[in-house]
Amino acid sequence: MSGRSKRESRGSTRGKRESESRGSSGRVKRERDREREPEAASSRGSPVRVKREFEPASAREAPASVVPFVRVKREREVDEDSEPEREVRAKNGRVDSEDRRSRHCPYLDTINRSVLDFDFEKLCSISLSHINAYACLVCGKYFQGRGLKSHAYIHSVQFSHHVFLNLHTLKFYCLPDNYEIIDSSLEDITYVLKPTFTKQQIANLDKQAKLSRAYDGTTYLPGIVGLNNIKANDYANAVLQALSNVPPLRNYFLEEDNYKNIKRPPGDIMFLLVQRFGELMRKLWNPRNFKAHVSPHEMLQAVVLCSKKTFQITKQGDGVDFLSWFLNALHSALGGTKKKKKTIVTDVFQGSMRIFTKKLPHPDLPAEEKEQLLHNDEYQETMVESTFMYLTLDLPTAPLYKDEKEQLIIPQVPLFNILAKFNGITEKEYKTYKENFLKRFQLTKLPPYLIFCIKRFTKNNFFVEKNPTIVNFPITNVDLREYLSEEVQAVHKNTTYDLIANIVHDGKPSEGSYRIHVLHHGTGKWYELQDLQVTDILPQMITLSEAYIQIWKRRDNDETNQQGA
């Protein structure tokens, strides 16, 4: 072997030995570091620990000093703050950066109160979900949630709208930072969303004549507020306006505690009508509204649902039919029954009467046979006691002939002439498909608030016809004592009534519109409301209208007439 090859073999052998020695020393060093690592970790207080095969479970748990690092509450993981956790922080006196941000949010000046409208249904404008709905206080739109991937979070990042209000908890939040905003300057927004009234405020409603100023500068009287006509719901608007000015009914629904604990069967949707009506009453009488009108959207949606689409927003309806259904549905939803259990509805509007009925022989029969039939028990007069929510007043038939100017003659009739139906003497014939009856009526109990429904529409086989007869009625001092039976007249100390609401139907039966005249008790003035339009009106002008529904208030002993004419 040459000298050169010997040198190369010795060099390769030496290199192998050095690499092996370096590898073994590296392994030894790594093993030493691995043994030292748990000791160093425990000395630093790190949560990292080595899991050993024979270590007991209690020894493997994190030490007490590690707990704050292990249990970290992240805002994007939890949608709602924990109240107990907030209380603990307050007791310990630890105010973190989140609390400081809550008190000093830099985005409060971006809130635009002029676009806020809480009258519509509380659902997300994207997902159409009612769950966890938030209102953007910059643009007024509704969004769901406030988590990392929620519609409200995406909206805040995309459009730089940062202040949101939870429509259910009434809490304010800043997104996307996701912290609660606590500021007293936002109380006016929560009051518009959910107005509240104390007993003292409710008692003074009819004594105040002070105008309120909306956010846009317009002035209005609480309670005399226009209702938005979404499409063809003016018939419902007029009825709701009239009922909102009946003090006992209004006072009952202004205080939510009066009805929120009423128990209803599971799945009962009728109680939704009570809740929505209460919300509408509080909005109509809110002295701190942002605008001088209210939209009855949520109320009407409850009407459509509970009436099974008998009454709709997009189709004109009959005011009397709606009033009759609404009062009975409200009575039933409040837990009332037909005979025994009473509610605020029956306490305010329900009266009673006697109905005398006598069957008539068929008109085509011979006179002798008629005489014989009249002696049978079937043709004897019977009497039943019945309750009523309103009285239907029949108008005389309108003339068919025109005057010398080729115009239809519009007749006039006094109110007391059509009230004679209930004096217990006047008989009227009622026809059915096979039989004819004579009926007369006599009142036995007068309610605190009496509703008159003037029958203007008659249906035949082809169309609905409207009677344009003008009813001449006084605004005050209508005494109904003569329409009571003699034995109950002594029980009724007060039988004098004053008008407080007058609903008018204008135009054709299918294409007409509704408006209402309302008395404001605080000022003693009359106002005309037609959808969003509110104007004052002289009492003398009210009697010239085609009255359709009227609400009269029974006068008390200590009450004086303040209505003027």
From Swiss-Prot:
InterPro entries: Papain-like_cys_pep_sf, Peptidase_C19_UCH, Ub_carboxyl-term_hydrolase, USP39, USP_dom, Znf_RING/FYVE/PHD, Znf_UBP. GO terms for cellular component: nucleoplasm; nucleus; spliceosomal complex; U4/U6 x U5 tri-snRNP complex. It is an enzyme of class 3 (hydrolase). It comes from the Eukaryota. There is a cross-link at residue 51 (Glycyl lysine isopeptide (Lys-Gly) (interchain with G-Cter in SUMO2)). Its EC number is 3.4.19.12. A zinc finger (UBP-type) spans 103-200. Residues 225-555 form the USP domain. Deubiquitinating enzyme that plays a role in many cellular processes including cellular antiviral response, epithelial morphogenesis, DNA repair or B-cell development. Plays a role in pre-mRNA splicing as a component of the U4/U6-U5 tri-snRNP, one of the building blocks of the precatalytic spliceosome. Specifically regulates immunoglobulin gene rearrangement in a spliceosome-dependent manner, which involves modulating chromatin interactions at the Igh locus and therefore plays an essential role in B-cell development. This is Ubiquitin carboxyl-terminal hydrolase 39. It comes from Homo sapiens.
